[in-house]
Amino acid sequence: MKPITPRSYALGWGAAFLLTLGACSPKTTSVATTSTTPPPTAEAAPATPSAAASFQIPVEYYTLPNGLKVVLSPDHTAPTATVAAYYNIGFRNEPRNRTGFAHLFEHLMFQGSQNLGKMEFIQLIQKNGGILNGSTRFDFTNYFEVVPAHKLETMLWAEADRMRGLAINQANLTNQQGVVKNEVRVNVLNQPYGGFPWLDMPQYANKNWNNAHNFYGDLKDLDAATLEDAQQFFKTYYAPNNAALAVVGDFEPAEAKAWVEKYFAGIPAVAQPPKPDLTEPRQEKEQRFTKDDKLATKPALAFAYHMPERNTPEYYALILLDQILLQGKDSRLYQAMVQKRGLTDDVSGGINYLGNAFNYAGPMLWMGNLTYDQTVKSDSVVSVLDQEINRLARGGIDQSTLDLAVVKLRSNLYDQLSGSDNFGRADMLASFALFDNNPARINTLEGEFRKVTPAVMQKTIQEYLRPTNRTVLIVNPLAKS
């Protein structure tokens, strides 16, 4: 897992919470082949970039009898294929007394399966010139592979092998408990601004335990995880009826459907426990907190506002307000805090620091953060934030400003969908399948934003960008500069 660096844009598909596979030093062992499809010979993956140009993306969506949601999106621009498996289990719905378990289990998924020994899944992709990774987010855990197109069947076989049965033993569990605890020490406990604000702010701003607990996990909880816990967690949450599979790239849909049926259809469904209640009460009073940081040399400040419910007109409006206020050097807050007043060198943030504005399911925060010199007062920073929001509220947002925000967002979104590895497309398709049962939303998103009116923008500012809906977290630096 890599430490999170807040991005300067809201829609990035960045490497948030990605498992660092390059440091795994895979063994040079052969791959077991008890499956009906033996792993093919190694070949280098071509690097031709994809050229997705619009939201008119091919989408074929269906559900297997065992409940697995499948999305196929052919793209013959480059001879590569991307496989993305998304499981509907993330930080928010991990067991109460097992904080950090969702992320711990992400690591266990690379420790071997029925037909692939420890590290052999990684070796299989790397030998075939591919790349792979996994991440743990608020509402899902995902795994993806990008390989030469003619290796697609092998990747589907391998991903199904993990879903069918994982090598969960005490040695693997103990080893990965140590790895995760070390990540906590390195990335949070022994790092200046460790966990700020992506890990800290949800704990201060939210009231519901599911949204507010330490996502990385308490070290005692990580130690307390038993082999039985891990086995039950896999059996429950890594079931086909709790997952979505997206396949994007250079393939023929009929052939890909046959492979998906061949390898995934026989995996049995498992009864799912009730989903936890993730709702947050309406915040009626501003909250301010201070966190001492013995390793930080400069003060830092983060602000957070509770988001509107996903897929509502106000939700789309706040995404556009984020473009106006916080995204890029032409944004209102950058201009006011950096260019005009010199309070900071940069201000960044967005919606969903562990992903983007679309790939989550529960409550979310719109956040921003910055560091500043000791001579700057935190009240001055908050005052400028209020001034810029009030300027929008008083002056209103005319149609031309709104149109510019849509164009800015559209450009950013298209950039992410045109990545050469097709992960941006796979991520959105799998997320929309998992949370909305409608991956074809990818082709109607721009239309949803164009429905937002200046009146809806004003309503959203008044309800969601009010000071009483805000949490402010200040880092008090204790280290000498």
Question: What do the predicted segments below correspond to?
Answer:
Residues 2-13:
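Bacterial N-terminal signal peptides that target proteins for export
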Residues 14-19:
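Hydrophobic helical h-region of N-terminal Sec-dependent signal peptides
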Residues 21-23:
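C-terminal motif of bacterial Sec signal peptides marking the signal peptidase cleavage site
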Residues 25-27:
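Bacterial signal peptide processing site
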Residues 45, 207, 240, 244-309, ...:
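An aromatic/glycine/proline-enriched structural segment found at the starts
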Residues 45-60, 202-243, 255, 275-280, ...:
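Histidine-acidic residue clusters that define the catalytic metal-binding segment
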Residues 48-87:
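Mature N-terminal segment immediately following signal peptide/propeptide cleavage
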Residues 78-94, 100-104, 118-163, 194-220, ...:
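M16 family metallopeptidases and their MPP-like homologs
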